[in-house]
Amino acid sequence: MKMRLHFVVDPMGWFCMSMVFFVWIYNSFLIPKLVLLPHYAEGHITAEPVICYYLASLLCFSALFRASTTDPGKLAQDPKIPLAERDNWELCNKCNMMRPKRSHHCSRCGHCVRRMDHHCPWINNCVGEDNHWLFLQLCFYTQVLSFYTLVLDFCQYYYFLPLSSVDQADFAVHHELALLRVSCFMGLIMFGGISSLFYTQVKGILTDTTTIEKMSHLTEEVPRRPWQQAMAEVFGTRWKVLWFLPFRSRHPLKLNLTIRSHV
């Protein structure tokens, strides 16, 4: 699958996504400036914590960018349906297009999405078959970055040695306490909310149930698959190390096809 940029024209989605971006850039700039770099310069910490924080920040932003700009599985205008699979397709009663079963018509985006999980305003995009793996990465790295930020906020006042060579006239240094309190508040909100979302997403994958199917009470009893198989289908590869890399393309990996009713 080629990496094509996909944008949704939705002012509310742009607003929600800008809030997420603000939280990311606030902590990615503030924590190194007030905590990591000054303590590294004075020899209180080694380079590893600094590198790890920047790496977590980079992976989080990469997953955010990829999840918001990757086509979630939009159906072509005139799909070519193989003869052997015609029984697994149906007509959408909103856009009058043929689509695979378990697809859903997104009223926000105005088109059908293959195996759509939900529309997420925080990434201004649908979460579907082709970008679900990126959404999972975003949730995972947001948890990592938020937790790391909370740990550093705590260490700044209760563990690290006092700094002696900082510029007290600098705005960020002068208002350090207030700025780090805001950082801590953001970290708590993000870590708590995303942890709950990540749990429900992983549970849905393991039970082969989308968020829309759960909300519509249209779930069916299906045999439980091994977790490795379920996750491999979402990420498009059996190589577990690749599950954590947003800098790649996904290729469909159908290990076990389950057909259900549509929503």
Curated annotation (Swiss-Prot):
One of its GO terms (biological process) is peptidyl-L-cysteine S-palmitoylation. The keyword Transferase applies. This is Palmitoyltransferase ZDHHC21. The active site is at C120 (s-palmitoyl cysteine intermediate). GO terms for molecular function: protein-cysteine S-palmitoyltransferase activity. Palmitoyltransferase that catalyzes the addition of palmitate onto various protein substrates. It catalyses: L-cysteinyl-[protein] + hexadecanoyl-CoA = S-hexadecanoyl-L-cysteinyl-[protein] + CoA. Belongs to the DHHC palmitoyltransferase family. Pfam families: DHHC. The chain crosses the membrane at residues 5-25, 45-65, 132-152, 182-202. It comes from Danio rerio (Zebrafish). Its EC number is 2.3.1.225.
